[in-house]
Amino acid sequence: SAAAGKAARTLPCEEEGLILSITTFDGKSESKPFLKCFGHTWIGLDNRTGHTVYLKDRAIPDGEMVTFSVWAVSGLSGLLFDLEPCYIVNYGRHTGRLSLSTNIGEEQLKVIEDYMEQHDKWTVDKNCSYWSIHLWNAVVGEDAALKIRGFVCTPEKIEQAFSAFDCVEVDKDFSRAGDIYCYKDGERTELQLCS
């Protein structure tokens, strides 16, 4: 359903070029009695340009993708890359996630890098949802901008903002992402999930 009675909009998204996505998971399918999962929101970048592109010091070859967001991981409140695909593949997590995607120009990679430089950690008031929606809006422009109500940004509010668009994808495939790493204070560290 379209927000506020307006017709739902379709974002241009060809299966070529650079594809930016914002994905949100409300946590409901992973919540249990007395244990609420609040969900997660992240950004994805899919390279289908025919050549390698670079995001910070990461080469993203044609046909590969990268995901990124800030996390509230104990001792590591920095910017983590490709953690979400590992959770999806190894643990079956984030089922029911919703994604919105659009094409961007390669010049927009600089906008993403600048945003990452200025906003490289999770905080209570600037959580993963806040971080992701503000990055998305900085890159895509007014026509594709997501609008939320209130001051606190949550996956649920991002899902509500998605209702303005008719091109929302369920359980987007992130299997072409690479290994997990993080940036904290400008330094890159390779990571692995515990088995």
Question: What kind of feature is each model-predicted range?
Answer:
Residues 2-126, 138, 158-195:
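Non-catalytic ligand/cofactor/substrate-binding and regulatory segments of enzyme domains
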Residues 131-136:
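PAPS/PAP-binding and catalytic site of the sulfotransferase fold
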Residues 119-128, 141-153:
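Surface-exposed patches in mature extracellular/periplasmic domains of secreted proteins
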